[in-house]
Amino acid sequence: MLFQVVLISGMQWGDEGKGKLVSLLSKDFDLVARYNGGHNSGHELFLDGVKYKLHLLPCGCLYPNTVNVLGNGVVVHLESLINEIDNLTKLGVDLTNRLFISERAHLVFDLHIAVDAQLENEQGEHSTSIGTTKRGIGPTNSTKCKRTGIQIGEMLNWDNFEKLLSKLTYKLCHENKVFTNSDTRDLLNKQLEQHKVNFSKIADSVVDTSYMIQKYIKEGKKVFFEGANGSLLDLALGTYPYVTSSNTTTSGVYNGLGINPNVKILKVGVLKAYQTRVGKGPFPTELFDENFNKLQKFGAEFGVTTGRVRRCGWLDLVAAKYVQNFSGFDLINLSKLDILSQFDEIKLCTHYKHKLTGKLLEEGRYPSCCYQYDEYEPVYKTMPGWKTDISKFKTFEELPQNAQNYVLFIEEYLGVFIYWIGTGRDVNSMIVRT
């Protein structure tokens, strides 16, 4: 790929297979930077027969010549980061002088995680829980907005960090009544001890990453931006309130990494060939029959972070068109097309029809509030399947005609060229069109 700066973002509710494309391309880039999310997201990658599970670390970490960055839009649970680094080390991945963390990235503390679990459990009693991963991401971003959160750069001045963590700990415990006073003191002491040990392992990696990335770009080096979660989970534009607490869309890269908006970026959207979702929230094309069982089984649809079974359904092109409208993707990677090889017929949602009036929702629009999803029903186009193993095919022309037609229909509907097609679980199982 000749473009100097490339961005990859998911077009659904996450789990689109972004990690596979990032991993495939990042070996050709000098720097890979993650701009949002935390250890709530997850990539499961298969490279040369080895399975790698990543949560916080960018996918570029698997290639020895690639520098990796966690930007200021990422929230970092330090213990999880250290564990992830250690796990990769055991698999032969050396991140020495290859991982850098923004001084401005906010820290996720165990107390944030406790608050997250408490809120989910309380809401669950009233059937109002969001279905979060309970990783503390929401409470961390909440304290960030309240200006009581703590940036990782504060740990470079330990005395000041102790004061900030003490203040935050007692404030959160008081507001949420999570612990007694004695438990709070014990938690604070434990957190200080853990963070002193863990921070000593990555202190030299904490830098001004915004400056670093801009320098790479000015020097003409190739830079790759990796988004976490998916566009329909965006705090502002997703299926609110069943969303994450950060900006997951293409526009999030500018704040999440401190990038000049005049930088020319090739924007790549990753779209799974069918629809999945973890946790609660609207899902117009969700399946509950044998087709769900097939998608879930052959697609191995379990959350990498939580292990929860993913909800599955037919591809929702109404949602994808909505995402394309505010994202402006230049190219698309259609992932996991091979999973649909199990079906005699395949459906795609092309419109939402109002249940009372029969009126179709205008193309490019998407419901804003949860109650509106109940007012519409999906309109499907049925296409014939191909019932052929496509995992060994290397060119578009080798695909069965019905598979080609499926790809071309999506391409025409969205008005974006589908450049990559995922045909198997290995990183290299990918058709690249020209």
Swiss-Prot record:
The record's annotation in PROSITE patterns points to: ADENYLOSUCCIN_SYN_1 (PS01266)
Which enzyme class? ligase
Q: Where in the cell is it found?
A: Cytoplasm
User: Is GTP-binding there in the keyword field?
Assistant: yes
Pathway stated in the Swiss-Prot or TrEMBL entry: Purine metabolism; AMP biosynthesis via de novo pathway; AMP from IMP: step 1/2
Positions contributing to IMP binding:
D15, E16, G17, K18, N40, S41, G42, H43, T133, R147, N229, T244, R308
A single Gene Ontology MF term assigned here is:
GTP binding
Q: Which InterPro entries match?
A: Adenylosuccin_syn_GTP-bd, Adenylosuccinate_synth_dom1, Adenylosuccinate_synth_dom2, Adenylosuccinate_synth_dom3, Adenylosuccinate_synthetase, P-loop_NTPase
Q: What is its EC number?
A: 6.3.4.4
GO cellular component terms attached to this protein's record: cytoplasm
Annotated binding of Mg(2+), by residue: D15, G42
Quaternary form? Answer: Homodimer.
The misc remark on file is:
Parasitic protozoa lack the de novo purine biosynthesis pathway and rely exclusively on the salvage pathway for their purine nucleotide requirements.
Q: Which family does it belong to?
A: Belongs to the adenylosuccinate synthetase family.
Q: Which NCBIfam families match?
A: PRK01117.1 (NF002223), purA (TIGR00184)
PANTHER family linked to this entry: ADENYLOSUCCINATE SYNTHETASE (PTHR11846:SF0)
Q: What does this protein do?
A: Plays an important role in the salvage pathway for purine nucleotide biosynthesis. Catalyzes the first committed step in the biosynthesis of AMP from IMP.
Protein name as it appears in the record: Adenylosuccinate synthetase
